[in-house]
Design a protein with these regions (language model features):
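Conserved N-terminal Rossmann-fold NAD(P)-binding element of oxidoreductases
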Residues: 3-7
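N-terminal Rossmann-fold NAD(P) dinucleotide-binding loop
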Residues: 12-13
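Aromatic pocket-lining residues of Rossmann-like dinucleotide-binding sites
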Residues: 19
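Short beta-strand element of Class I
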Residues: 27-29
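Helix N-cap at the beta1-alpha1 junction of Rossmann-like dinucleotide-binding domains, i.e.
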Residues: 33-37
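Conserved Rossmann-fold cofactor-binding substructure of NAD(P)-dependent oxidoreductases
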Residues: 54-72, 81
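Rossmann-fold NAD(P)-binding glycine/threonine-rich loop
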Residues: 100-123
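Rossmann-like NAD(P)H-binding beta-loop-alpha module
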Residues: 119, 124-143
């Protein structure tokens, strides 16, 4: 599988770190507008599966071209872009996951559900720290 990680900061690094260990992962394209972040990520994750790309996510045409070659895109950038990213994912038939962070944006993403189903695309918004990890830790503490 081919993945696109949007954002080469701490969260993007963590996602890329986990992805390159997957046996079925062919490549992990990591895109960021900050070349210093990309250089640091490549330095810390020297793996042939990692492909750094300088990209501004607001350049929708360039982003769509990149997404069209990918199976799954993971947004590790600010929530402000997630709704537009989800729409581009639908247009390119790319599965999409984001870390969430804003209920209004997530609600807008949920409104794309029917279209996503029709196109056979999975969109999973708000898969960040809470409710994900926080819920698991709460269950663990309760047990």
């Amino acid at each position: 599988m081919k993945f696109l990680v949007l954002g080469a900061g701490k969260m993007g690094y963590a996602v890329a770190y986990d992805l390159i260990r997957g046996a079925k992962v062919e490549k992990v394209v990591v895109a960021d507008s900050n070349t210093d972040n990309l250089k640091e990520l490549v330095k810390r994750l020297p793996d042939e599966k990692i492909i750094p790309v300088e990209l501004d996510v607001t350049n929708e045409e360039e982003l769509a071209q990149l997404m069209a070659e990918i199976d799954v895109a993971v947004s590790c950038i600010t929530y402000k872009h997630n709704y537009e990213l989800a729409k581009i994912a639908l247009a390119t038939k790319t599965h999409f996951v984001d870390l969430g962070g804003n209920e209004e944006i997530v609600a807008k993403e949920f409104m794309l559900d029917e279209l996503a189903k029709e196109q056979g695309v999975t969109i999973i918004p708000d898969l960040g720290l809470a409710p994900g990890l926080v819920s698991l830790l709460a269950v663990s503490a309760a047990e």
